[in-house]
Structures are given as C-alpha cells and as structure tokens.
Amino acid sequence: MAPPALQAQPPGGSQLRFLLFLLLLLLLLSWPSQGDALAMPEQRPSGPESQLNADELRGRFQDLLSRLHANQSREDSNSEPSPDPAVRILSPEVRLGSHGQLLLRVNRASLSQGLPEAYRVHRALLLLTPTARPWDITRPLKRALSLRGPRAPALRLRLTPPPDLAMLPSGGTQLELRLRVAAGRGRRSAHAHPRDSCPLGPGRCCHLETVQATLEDLGWSDWVLSPRQLQLSMCVGECPHLYRSANTHAQIKARLHGLQPDKVPAPCCVPSSYTPVVLMHRTDSGVSLQTYDDLVARGCHCA
C-alpha cells in the first residue's frame, strides 16, 4: 500500500532538530553498507561486531521518541500559549441624538457571551452602513465599561462621529469587537475557567478526544516501522451558535445557518493547531524519518 499524501516538514525547536540529527547519524553508522537496508539478520556478519537489526533500531527510535515527548511536555508547561483572541459581531441600537451626536445602546452581556471572565475588549469598530469606513470607538466603549457603580444591563454611549462619517444610521449597523485575555491574567484564568461553556451540556460541543490506533488500524503496517501505536487527538462534537468561532466567516456562517439551514451548513469542529509526529518508515532505498505537522490535532475550533 502506498503511503498517504501527507506533507512532511522538519519540526521546529533546536532540541528536536539536534535529537533527530543524532538518530540519523546512528542510522548512517549502524546500517549495512551494501544490499537491502531491510535485509534479514542471517545475511549480516555474526558476532559482537554485527550490525543493528530492525528490532534494535526500533527500540532506539522508541527511546528517542519518548525523550522527544518529554521535552515537548516540558516546553508546553513552561511556555503555555495564551488563549486565542475572540471576535464578536453585534447589532447595536443606534439613533440620531441632538447636535449631530449618535446614541448607541449595546447589551452588556453580549460583549463576551460564552467567553471566560479574563477576556477584555481590545478594539471596537462601528460600521454605520455596510459600505462605510469602520469607526474606531474603542476608547469611549472602554471608558463606559470602566465606570464604577451599578452595572446596568445595557451600555449607552453618546458619540460624535467624524465629518466623513456624518450620516444617518441604517438598519445594517454593526459593532465588531475584538477581545483578548487581559495581561497578567491569562494563565491563571485559563486554568480557573474553561475556555468556553458548552450550551448543549458537558462533552457535546467541539473538543479534543484522544483515540489509540495501531498501524494495522490505519493500514500503515506495510510501510511504517515505528511507532507501532499512535495516540491520535481528534476534533469531535457539535458547533452551536458562536461557539469557538474560528473567525468572522465562521460567525457569519453560523448566523446564516440559523436563518437558512437548507442552504448554509453549520460550522464544523476542525483542528486549530497540530502536534508534530515523527514516523520511521520504509523507502525504496532503506529507512527514512519524516515529521508530519498536520496529523495529530492539538486544539479545535468551529469553522
């Protein structure tokens, strides 16, 4: 069976490259100089000076793979990535006030619905019409959010538009919010709160799920030598409205699916990042090592 068409790329990180270099050097020094690279042991010289056979090489490879995984785990624990930024598209209430000002009303709960408390507004852009230039209202919105006192269910902003945006608001006004985890709170909050709260119940929304599979399960036993068993992280679960949206396109897709489910499919749970996997496999010339960067999922989102 021919190997699947996967893109093979070198892994990142100096430690990983150095260890792979050592293993390649071991293969060059220990592999037979003539004949088939996968020749049977009886075809090689016997005695303490004999060449390493395939089983011994597999053992060395498994040991190296264990050390690579240990190094990767230490790197992950020491440099945990920040949670992904989030985007919200809202439809605020806008009306014309006195002296050419615009009165904007936004539901406070909709600003960070479905996100942990650590998320804060990073930027706010108001589009009065679909063709209008975005109007940055980050400062007045943050100022309204920082006011102390009783928290009203809605934020009310009185805005003076720039001259080139002096126009009557239309029914298509949109507010685009870009949210990030507040500085200094990301790691603690990421552990204290789940990234998203699934409205369908625990375990039903888009998430990672690990499945163990052998080379025989995958149909790879005729060309892959090591590892003999893989832990494959898969993205499974449903994508309810605005849950873990990958981007603005995914949010629009979710909205249109709610309006026209027969024409627009719902967003799907797909990988957002991957963990590199090293495979030792047979080639026409012997044995080769390849790193597959798009085989095992590391994170999931809806797209």
Curated annotation (Swiss-Prot):
Keywords linked to the UniProt accession: Cleavage on pair of basic residues, Cytokine, Disulfide bond, Glycoprotein, Hormone, Secreted, Signal
Location(s), subcellular: Secreted
Glycosylation-annotated residues: N71
Cystine connections: C198-C205, C206-C269, C235-C300, C239-C302
GO MF annotation terms: cytokine activity; growth factor activity; hormone activity; protein homodimerization activity
Secretion signal span: 1-30
Expression triggers: Produced in response to various stresses, such as metabolic and toxin-induced stresses or drugs. Expression is activated by ATF4 and DDIT3/CHOP transcription factors downstream of the integrated stress response (ISR). Induced in macrophages in response to lysosomal stress in a Tfeb-dependent manner. Expressed in response to mitochondrial stress. Expression is induced by metformin, a blood-glucose-lowering drug. Expression is induced by cisplatin and camptothecin anticancer drugs. Expressed following sustained high-fat feeding or dietary amino acid imbalance. Also induced by physical activity.
Source organism superkingdom: Eukaryota
Name this polypeptide is given: Growth/differentiation factor 15
Lineage: Eukaryota, Metazoa, Chordata, Craniata, Vertebrata
